[in-house]
């Protein structure tokens, strides 16, 4: 009789004991020295995982009694990394982070271990973000990681307007010539306009003038001077004085300026590259007259006072929410004829004009508020049914591809007004909830820390309005809450609320702002509003219609301006500020 017995996890058991022997310096026959640190190991283990070690043993015709010594340059691999590599060789486990991924890639290259290289490659792909894509591109080029290189390049191209801005330029000025030239040559480069591309080129050259001046002539040809404003052309002309062999470039600039003097003034928009960005307000979904739900996606191009239809949503809904993050618009929730609180979530790619289905929200929501903070998408509060409010704040985790509970507000509310401060804090200001059996807007400010998942500051204040307020920051610690009946300035440092004499004028149709309107702050103290319900001129009839107009409020002077008429009158659409690529004008 014969019976076969197999030990469970025997391979792991053997390697664990070998690793213990290594750490106790038992039975070792090789040593790795890094900056006076000596690490002992077993030749047979390292030869099994590293072709480098196997090659050293075979090429030197080592006997079983010989000991192998390897000295590693500490400028290439640190002692801590070598220790981590040895743990990986013996256990097959490794913890990779943004801090150690570069040295682990060096270790994988040094010991010729392709599986570790694959792990590092996968980590870079899963963790790439706007703030690290420039560094990741450097790593990808250095270690020949094509997929990472393509993703990182796309991240830089799609966020060039950030990298070329004062906020991101400090790091971007170190961009290698081969990458910088490739970016300027890209027709889909996401610049604010061609002025930014030319200014970035000049700043990049002057950052290291002696070594980069030779690239200026080649890179200058990638700029469309006809799309650059006179002011920036004059600025560039003055900067050319400090560069050698600049006469040809100066002549080109002078030629463009002279042609403009002789021709009628025209918009520079038609000359911009396809990827140049247009500040736009995007309207999604909503309910039409007679109760029909809408799936249209419309964009109001602020600069041109022009409406365009971009796409159609994968579903029809009103009281949904939306937010933009880079080239994407995220939408979720809403109500339809059959369902009062949808869980569905989608992502719209403005560049490719395509939709991607996202995992459902944990619960169905209406009148929730979606917002982007630090490049991450959040959903704040909302209703799961009539008069049933939630305090949940959800975060969409791109790595896990799931909605996660980020934290909770101090009280359950829907219809909240939210403003971000930096890349960390959400200020959730007022919202609707049940007060003594009635739906009422409450005066509360929650400062939600997205890193800790906690409300780190909660301020309550009396309010005399039940409509939706407008928010803005004055200086660093003053939060302004503007409304028709009352405005409040909240000192976040002193935790004190003071009434303000300024107020928001009623809409030109004499209606107050409420949750049925699409409301969007567009910078420079200006607020965009469209849609929503309005009462009939004869108040005796108590009849309601949908507002067919769009308005722009200049808060500095307290006046409304009527804009181009939207394609459709919509009640409770979603609304967000987005940067659309110029190529959509060619696509329409």
From Swiss-Prot:
<feature type="repeat" description="Kelch 2">
    <location>
        <begin position="328"/>
        <end position="375"/>
    </location>
</feature>
<keyword id="KW-0217">Developmental protein</keyword>
<dbReference type="GO" id="GO:0033150">
    <property type="term" value="C:cytoskeletal calyx"/>
</dbReference>
<dbReference type="Pfam" id="PF13964">
    <property type="entry name" value="Kelch_6"/>
</dbReference>
<dbReference type="GO" id="GO:0005856">
    <property type="term" value="C:cytoskeleton"/>
</dbReference>
<dbReference type="Pfam" id="PF01344">
    <property type="entry name" value="Kelch_1"/>
</dbReference>
<dbReference type="InterPro" id="IPR006652">
    <property type="entry name" value="Kelch_1"/>
</dbReference>
<feature type="repeat" description="Kelch 6">
    <location>
        <begin position="526"/>
        <end position="580"/>
    </location>
</feature>
<keyword id="KW-0677">Repeat</keyword>
<comment type="subunit">
    <text>Interacts with CYLC1; the interaction may be relevant for proper acrosome attachment to the nuclear envelope.</text>
</comment>
<comment type="function">
    <text>Required for both nuclear and acrosomal shaping during spermiogenesis.</text>
</comment>
<dbReference type="InterPro" id="IPR048070">
    <property type="entry name" value="Calicin_BTB_POZ"/>
</dbReference>
<feature type="domain" description="BACK">
    <location>
        <begin position="133"/>
        <end position="235"/>
    </location>
</feature>
<feature type="modified residue" description="Phosphoserine">
    <location>
        <position position="149"/>
    </location>
</feature>
<keyword id="KW-0597">Phosphoprotein</keyword>
<protein>
    <recommendedName>
        <fullName>Calicin</fullName>
    </recommendedName>
</protein>
<dbReference type="InterPro" id="IPR000210">
    <property type="entry name" value="BTB/POZ_dom"/>
</dbReference>
<feature type="repeat" description="Kelch 5">
    <location>
        <begin position="476"/>
        <end position="525"/>
    </location>
</feature>
<dbReference type="GO" id="GO:0007283">
    <property type="term" value="P:spermatogenesis"/>
</dbReference>
<feature type="repeat" description="Kelch 1">
    <location>
        <begin position="280"/>
        <end position="327"/>
    </location>
</feature>
<keyword id="KW-0744">Spermatogenesis</keyword>
<dbReference type="InterPro" id="IPR011333">
    <property type="entry name" value="SKP1/BTB/POZ_sf"/>
</dbReference>
<dbReference type="InterPro" id="IPR011705">
    <property type="entry name" value="BACK"/>
</dbReference>
<keyword id="KW-0206">Cytoskeleton</keyword>
<dbReference type="Pfam" id="PF07707">
    <property type="entry name" value="BACK"/>
</dbReference>
<dbReference type="Pfam" id="PF00651">
    <property type="entry name" value="BTB"/>
</dbReference>
<feature type="repeat" description="Kelch 3">
    <location>
        <begin position="377"/>
        <end position="423"/>
    </location>
</feature>
<feature type="repeat" description="Kelch 4">
    <location>
        <begin position="425"/>
        <end position="475"/>
    </location>
</feature>
<keyword id="KW-0880">Kelch repeat</keyword>
<dbReference type="InterPro" id="IPR015915">
    <property type="entry name" value="Kelch-typ_b-propeller"/>
</dbReference>
<feature type="domain" description="BTB">
    <location>
        <begin position="28"/>
        <end position="98"/>
    </location>
</feature>
<dbReference type="GO" id="GO:0030154">
    <property type="term" value="P:cell differentiation"/>
</dbReference>
<keyword id="KW-0221">Differentiation</keyword>
<keyword id="KW-0963">Cytoplasm</keyword>
């Amino acid at each position: 009789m014969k019976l076969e017995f197999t030990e469970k996890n025997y391979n792991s058991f053997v390697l664990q004991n070998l690793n213990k022997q290594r750490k106790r310096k038992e039975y070792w026959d090789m040593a790795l020295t890094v900056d006076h640190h000596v690490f002992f190991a077993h030749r047979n283990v390292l030869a099994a995982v590293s072709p480098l070690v196997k090659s050293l043993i075979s090429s030197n015709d080592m006997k079983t009694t010989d000991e192998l010594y390897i000295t590693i340059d500490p400028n290439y691999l640190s002692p801590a990394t070598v220790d981590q590599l040895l743990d990986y060789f013996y256990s097959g486990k490794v913890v990779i982070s943004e801090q150690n991924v570069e040295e682990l890639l060096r270790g994988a290259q040094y010991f010729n271990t392709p599986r570790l290289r694959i792990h590092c490659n996968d980590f870079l792909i899963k963790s790439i973000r706007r703030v690290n894509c420039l560094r990741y591109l450097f790593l990808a080029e250095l270690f020949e990681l094509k997929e990472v290189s393509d993703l990182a390049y796309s991240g830089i191209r799609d966020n060039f307007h950030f990298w070329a801005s004062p906020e991101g330029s400090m790091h971007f000025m170190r961009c290698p010539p081969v990458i910088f030239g490739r970016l300027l040559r890209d027709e889909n480069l996401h610049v604010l306009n061609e002025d930014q591309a030319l200014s970035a080129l000049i700043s990049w050259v002057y950052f290291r003038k002696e070594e980069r001046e030779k690239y200026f002539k080649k890179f200058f040809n990638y700029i469309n001077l006809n799309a650059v404003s006179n002011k920036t052309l004059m600025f560039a002309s003055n900067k050319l004085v400090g560069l050698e062999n600049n006469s040809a470039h100066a002549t080109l600039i002078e030629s463009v300026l002279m042609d403009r003097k002789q021709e009628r003034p025209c918009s520079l928009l038609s000359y911009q590259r396809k990827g140049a960005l247009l500040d736009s307000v995007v309207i999604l979904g909503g309910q039409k007259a007679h109760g029909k739900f809408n799936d249209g996606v419309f964009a109001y191009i602020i600069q041109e006072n022009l409406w365009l239809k971009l796409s159609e949503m994968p579903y029809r809904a009103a009281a949904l929410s939306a937010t933009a993050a880079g080239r994407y618009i995220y939408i979720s929730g809403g109500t339809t004829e059959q369902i009062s609180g949808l869980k569905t979530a989608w992502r719209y790619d403005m560049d490719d004009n395509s939709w991607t289905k996202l995992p459902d929200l944990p619960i169905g929501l209406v009148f929730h508020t979606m917002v982007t903070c630090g490049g991450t998408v959040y959903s704040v509060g909302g209703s799961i049914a009539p008069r049933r409010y939630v305090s949940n704040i959800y975060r969409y985790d791109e790595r896990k591809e799931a909605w996660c509970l980020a934290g909770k507000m101090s009280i359950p509310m829907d219809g909240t007004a939210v403003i971000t401060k930096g890349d960390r804090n959400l200020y959730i200001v007022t919202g609707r909830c049940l007060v003594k059996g009635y739906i009422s807007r409450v005066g509360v400010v929650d400062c939600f820390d997205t890193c800790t998942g906690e409300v780190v500051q909660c301020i309550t204040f009396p309010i005399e309005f039940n409509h939706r307020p407008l928010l803005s920051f004055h200086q660093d610690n003053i939060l302004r809450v503007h409304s028709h009946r009352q405005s409040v300035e909240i000192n976040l440092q002193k935790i004190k609320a003071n009434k303000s004499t300024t107020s928001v004028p009623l809409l030109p149709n004499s209606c107050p702002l409420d949750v049925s309107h699409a409301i969007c702050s567009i910078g420079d103290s200006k607020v965009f509003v469209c849609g929503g319900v309005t009462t009939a001129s004869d108040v005796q009839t108590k009849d309601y219609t949908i507002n067919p107009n769009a308005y722009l409020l200049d808060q500095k002077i307290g006046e409304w301006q009527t804009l181009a008429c939207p394609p459709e009158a919509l009640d409770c659409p979603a609304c967000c500020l987005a940067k659309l690529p110029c190529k959509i004008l060619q696509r329409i």
